[in-house]
Amino acid sequence: MENVQRLDCPVCGGKGTFVITSHQIDIPYFGPVLETTMICEKCNFRRSDVFPLEVREPKKYILKIESERDLNKRVVRSSSAYIQIPELGVEIKPGPLAEGFVSNVEGVLNRVDNILQTLIRWAETEEQKKKAEELRERIKKLKEGKEEATLILIDPLGHSAIIGEGVEEEILSEEEVEKLKEGIVIMDLDKDKEKEKE
């Protein structure tokens, strides 16, 4: 069932132009998630995220992209997840503007390619443009099955996953979780209660 709300836009102040759409979907081998999209019809501000509706452990997922078949593996990325492709030097960190999505490996590569296209337009030097164009070419080869790389998804909140055969999963240690949470805004009501008791 889809839930739609209209509010005033917190970005531009447009009256009733901020549309929040949320719906629950069930992802095989992951469980139910709430997918939320926020769009302002006036200023075009857009944000989306994915929230699992079941408690999950903080994990790291590792997938070797070795063939075109691997491009179809499902990726659930929440705004708290890190995405890495070490062979390409790609690291996408979570933050206030990070977006969650449900896609596949090819969709992740397309998102990286879109970022590179933007970098090419904004590049200040020819060297920066050349590096971005080389990375785009490597992504193209990955999608054609002519190159191999590793996709790593790390989520200290456990809200993300790579789903499919051949995916390695590692539960994160408490130390890893604390280190990764540094860049993420989290409201922990239990900690606030503990402080009140002191």
Curated annotation (Swiss-Prot):
Signal peptide: none annotated. SMART domains: Zpr1. InterPro entries: Znf_ZPR1, ZPR1, ZPR1-like_arc, ZPR1_A/B_dom, ZPR1_jr_dom, ZPR1_Znf1/2. One of its GO terms (molecular function) is zinc ion binding. A zinc finger (C4-type) spans 9-43. It comes from the Archaea. Keywords: Metal-binding, Zinc, Zinc-finger. Belongs to the ZPR1 family. PANTHER family: ZINC FINGER PROTEIN ZPR1 (PTHR10876:SF0). This is Uncharacterized ZPR1-like protein MJ0530.
